[in-house]
Amino acid sequence: MSSSNVKKVALAYSGGLDTSVILKWLQETYGCEVVTFTADLGQGEEVEPARAKAQAMGVKEIYIDDLREEFSRDFVFPMFRANAIYEGEYLLGTSIARPLIAKRLIEIANETGADAIAHGATGKGNDQVRFELGAYALRPDIRVIAPWREWELTSRETLLAYAESRGIPIEMKRGKTSPYSMDANLLHISYEGGILEDPWAEPEETMWRWSVSPENAPDRPTYVELTYEHGDIVAIDGERMTAAAVLARLNQLGGANGIGRLDIVENRYVGMKSRGCYETPGGTIMLKAHRAIESITLDREVAHLKDELMPRYASLIYNGYWWSPERRMLQQMIDASQATVNGVVRVKLYKGNVSVVGRKSESNSLFDMNIATFEDDRGAYDQKDAEGFIKLNALRLRIAGRKGASFA
């Protein structure tokens, strides 16, 4: 499909510099009508100004959707049932937001009769892959326009010059841009670029926006009780909440105690290494607490199998395969495992640390104090049974040893 065949484009629009320039560029380059879509994922910024900017550039169809609850309930919570982390550290805050944006963008394209969608992801990053894999899965014949892979605007300064030359309303001025590229939603805020491109450079304390430094966190710990039903947090300190409210509250509690900061170099799907800094206070608490409630409610082999599958599941999300048959299959297995994950976890938040200090389940605990006790178990467990168990498991080792094998 050539540019002349594109009549209407649905644009994922934040109202910032990049997507505002993209909006005008689409109008000029493709001569098409543009529909804008702005998602409120709990990024903490006013999204309504995006409406005024889009209107000022002649956009007739403007969508601004509050997706905070859907994001938390249908994307973040299912991911945390799996205890998903990428490369042992990253809690996938950016990755998990992209499939929802792609889904809603395709829905809007269908509603408005758009024959193409557009996004502001660069040609170097993972987001282009995540947006487009999702879009093609949900509408195989959709045309995707990725301006960063087409135009000759290669820097923030050239974008600002373009905006000025066309009267695009942009708050930031040339030479006064933020040193970091930031992305936020209810799960996290990320920082890239600037001095972070040097993996040896320590970020300034002023970069962090959601959390106090652990050194300056309160000198007294905060205790929190989290109630779980089927693997999801449904109440904090006994107060039942929606998924979005749970995440917002845990972000507050974690941020106030210096929890959730992360500075990593990760392997992007496109092949390069990238350094990023993240604040995920609520998610950090959720991961620790969920593993704790699973520790007393999951069968050993089920728990171990989940741990084996988790890296694969996390990679699927990181690489953009949320809308795939393999992710769906894994999700069904994970969700089935959570039927018994019910109970309460008590955590202590103190100077950047999350410590589990209690866990209980009235209906589904597999922890038997009568068997596990170091005191007199009154015959609940016959220690003599261990001898046969050990000998059976040692049989292959003993046979190999008799045949001359050396394990030292």
Curated annotation (Swiss-Prot):
**From its record, what is one biological process in GO terms?**
L-arginine biosynthetic process
Spell out the GO cellular component terms annotated for this protein, sorted alphabetically and separated by semicolons: cytoplasm
Fetch the InterPro entries from UniProt. Answer: Arginosuc_syn_C, Arginosuc_syn_N, Arginosuc_synth, Arginosuc_synth_CS, Arginosuc_synth_type_1_subfam, AS_cat/multimer_dom_body, Rossmann-like_a/b/a_fold
Do the record's keywords include Flavoprotein? Answer: no
Give the metabolic or biological pathway: Amino-acid biosynthesis; L-arginine biosynthesis; L-arginine from L-ornithine and carbamoyl phosphate: step 2/3
Q: Which CDD domains match?
A: ASS (cd01999)
Query: What PROSITE patterns does this protein map onto?
Result: ARGININOSUCCIN_SYN_1 (PS00564), ARGININOSUCCIN_SYN_2 (PS00565)
- What EC number(s) does this enzyme carry? 6.3.4.5
Q: What class of enzyme is it?
A: ligase
- GO MF entries: argininosuccinate synthase activity; ATP binding
Q: Which UniProt keywords apply?
A: Amino-acid biosynthesis, Arginine biosynthesis, ATP-binding, Cytoplasm, Ligase, Nucleotide-binding
Q: Where in the cell is it found?
A: Cytoplasm
Pfam families given for it? Answer: Arginosuc_syn_C (PF20979), Arginosuc_synth (PF00764)
Q: Binding of L-citrulline: at which residues? A: Y90, S95, N126, R130, S181, S190, E266, Y278
Among its keywords, does the record have Ligase? yes
- What catalytic reaction does the record list? L-citrulline + L-aspartate + ATP = 2-(N(omega)-L-arginino)succinate + AMP + diphosphate + H(+)
- The region annotated as signal peptide is none
Which residues are involved in binding ATP? A12, Y13, S14, G15, G16, L17, D18, T19, S20, A39, G120
List of residues binding L-aspartate: T122, N126, D127
Q: Which family does it belong to?
A: Belongs to the argininosuccinate synthase family. Type 1 subfamily.
Q: Describe the protein's quaternary organization and the partners it interacts with.
A: Homotetramer.
Identify this protein by name.
Answer: Argininosuccinate synthase
Native source species = Methylococcus capsulatus (strain ATCC 33009 / NCIMB 11132 / Bath)
**Lineage, opening ranks:** Bacteria, Pseudomonadati, Pseudomonadota, Gammaproteobacteria, Methylococcales
Gene name for this UniProt entry: argG
